[in-house]
Amino acid sequence: MEAKATAKFVRYTPRKVNQVLALIRNKKVEKTLEILSFLPKSTAVLVKKVLKSATANAGKFEDYSGLKVKEAWVGNGPILKRIRAGSKGRSMPIKKRTVHLTIIVTDASTYLRKK
Protein backbone atom coordinates (compact mmCIF):
# COMPACT_ATOMS: atom_id res chain seq x y z
CA MET A 1 0.00 0.00 0.00
CA GLU A 2 1.29 3.42 -0.93
CA ALA A 3 0.55 6.76 0.69
CA LYS A 4 1.40 10.18 -0.64
CA ALA A 5 1.73 13.65 0.86
CA THR A 6 2.40 16.94 -0.89
CA ALA A 7 3.32 20.45 0.20
CA LYS A 8 2.84 23.13 -2.44
CA PHE A 9 3.97 26.74 -2.84
CA VAL A 10 6.53 26.53 -0.01
CA ARG A 11 9.11 29.34 0.15
CA TYR A 12 12.35 27.36 -0.09
CA THR A 13 14.66 26.92 -3.05
CA PRO A 14 14.47 23.57 -4.86
CA ARG A 15 18.22 23.05 -4.58
CA LYS A 16 18.22 23.27 -0.78
CA VAL A 17 15.22 20.95 -0.41
CA ASN A 18 16.75 18.42 -2.80
CA GLN A 19 19.90 18.20 -0.64
CA VAL A 20 17.75 16.99 2.27
CA LEU A 21 15.68 14.64 0.10
CA ALA A 22 18.85 12.93 -1.13
CA LEU A 23 19.51 11.81 2.45
CA ILE A 24 16.11 10.14 2.96
CA ARG A 25 15.35 8.36 -0.32
CA ASN A 26 14.93 4.55 -0.05
CA LYS A 27 15.30 4.50 3.75
CA LYS A 28 12.97 3.31 6.48
CA VAL A 29 10.72 5.97 8.01
CA GLU A 30 12.04 5.41 11.55
CA LYS A 31 15.62 6.03 10.40
CA THR A 32 14.55 8.97 8.25
CA LEU A 33 12.80 10.77 11.12
CA GLU A 34 15.91 10.29 13.24
CA ILE A 35 18.11 11.79 10.51
CA LEU A 36 15.79 14.77 10.03
CA SER A 37 15.63 15.48 13.76
CA PHE A 38 19.36 16.13 13.99
CA LEU A 39 19.93 17.73 10.59
CA PRO A 40 20.99 21.40 10.90
CA LYS A 41 19.10 22.59 7.83
CA SER A 42 15.93 24.66 7.88
CA THR A 43 14.37 22.57 5.10
CA ALA A 44 14.56 19.46 7.30
CA VAL A 45 11.58 20.78 9.30
CA LEU A 46 9.46 20.97 6.13
CA VAL A 47 10.51 17.51 4.93
CA LYS A 48 9.80 15.99 8.36
CA LYS A 49 6.33 17.54 8.40
CA VAL A 50 5.46 16.16 4.95
CA LEU A 51 6.90 12.74 5.85
CA LYS A 52 4.74 12.55 8.98
CA SER A 53 1.72 13.49 6.88
CA ALA A 54 2.49 10.69 4.42
CA THR A 55 2.75 8.12 7.23
CA ALA A 56 -0.54 9.36 8.66
CA ASN A 57 -2.11 8.96 5.22
CA ALA A 58 -0.85 5.37 5.25
CA GLY A 59 -2.92 4.80 8.40
CA LYS A 60 0.03 4.52 10.77
CA PHE A 61 0.00 7.52 13.09
CA GLU A 62 2.62 6.54 15.69
CA ASP A 63 3.80 3.12 14.51
CA TYR A 64 6.28 3.73 11.70
CA SER A 65 7.62 0.17 11.57
CA GLY A 66 7.36 -1.45 8.18
CA LEU A 67 7.18 1.80 6.21
CA LYS A 68 9.80 2.93 3.74
CA VAL A 69 10.27 6.11 1.70
CA LYS A 70 9.68 4.93 -1.86
CA GLU A 71 9.96 8.25 -3.68
CA ALA A 72 10.72 11.82 -2.69
CA TRP A 73 11.02 14.64 -5.17
CA VAL A 74 10.82 18.39 -5.39
CA GLY A 75 9.42 20.44 -8.24
CA ASN A 76 9.67 24.10 -9.06
CA GLY A 77 6.78 26.29 -8.02
CA PRO A 78 6.07 29.80 -9.25
CA ILE A 79 8.87 32.34 -8.85
CA LEU A 80 8.14 35.60 -7.05
CA LYS A 81 10.01 38.35 -8.86
CA ARG A 82 11.22 41.35 -6.86
CA ILE A 83 13.47 44.27 -7.72
CA ARG A 84 16.52 45.56 -5.87
CA ALA A 85 18.13 48.92 -6.54
CA GLY A 86 21.36 48.67 -8.48
CA SER A 87 24.14 51.06 -9.36
CA LYS A 88 23.67 54.05 -11.70
CA GLY A 89 19.88 54.04 -11.25
CA ARG A 90 19.40 50.53 -12.56
CA SER A 91 17.34 47.76 -11.02
CA MET A 92 18.49 44.22 -10.35
CA PRO A 93 16.04 41.29 -10.25
CA ILE A 94 15.61 39.05 -7.21
CA LYS A 95 13.99 35.65 -7.71
CA LYS A 96 12.23 34.26 -4.66
CA ARG A 97 11.69 30.62 -5.53
CA THR A 98 8.99 28.26 -4.30
CA VAL A 99 8.76 24.47 -4.35
CA HIS A 100 6.24 21.66 -4.56
CA LEU A 101 7.42 18.75 -2.37
CA THR A 102 6.05 15.20 -2.73
CA ILE A 103 6.87 12.14 -0.62
CA ILE A 104 5.52 8.62 -1.21
CA VAL A 105 5.83 5.94 1.47
CA THR A 106 5.08 2.25 1.07
CA ASP A 107 5.18 -0.96 3.08
CA ALA A 108 8.72 -2.30 3.23
CA SER A 109 7.43 -5.85 2.71
CA THR A 110 5.85 -5.00 -0.66
CA TYR A 111 8.62 -2.66 -1.74
CA LEU A 112 10.69 -4.03 -4.61
CA ARG A 113 14.00 -2.29 -5.13
CA LYS A 114 14.75 -1.38 -8.74
CA LYS A 115 18.06 -2.64 -10.07
Swiss-Prot record:
GO terms in the biological process aspect are: translation
Q: Which GO terms describe its molecular function?
A: rRNA binding; structural constituent of ribosome
The entry's protein name is Large ribosomal subunit protein uL22
Matching NCBIfam families: rplV_bact
Query: Which keywords does this chain's UniProt record carry?
Result: Ribonucleoprotein, Ribosomal protein, RNA-binding, rRNA-binding
Query: What is its quaternary makeup?
Result: Part of the 50S ribosomal subunit.
Instruction: Give a short account of what the protein does.
Output: This protein binds specifically to 23S rRNA; its binding is stimulated by other ribosomal proteins, e.g. L4, L17, and L20. It is important during the early stages of 50S assembly. It makes multiple contacts with different domains of the 23S rRNA in the assembled 50S subunit and ribosome. The globular domain of the protein is located near the polypeptide exit tunnel on the outside of the subunit, while an extended beta-hairpin is found that lines the wall of the exit tunnel in the center of the 70S ribosome.
Q: Which InterPro entries match?
A: Ribosomal_uL22, Ribosomal_uL22_bac/chlpt-type, Ribosomal_uL22_bac/org-type, Ribosomal_uL22_sf
Classification via Pfam families: Ribosomal_L22
Query: Where does it sit, as one GO cellular component term?
Result: cytosolic large ribosomal subunit
Family according to the record:
Belongs to the universal ribosomal protein uL22 family.
The gene from which this protein is expressed is rplV
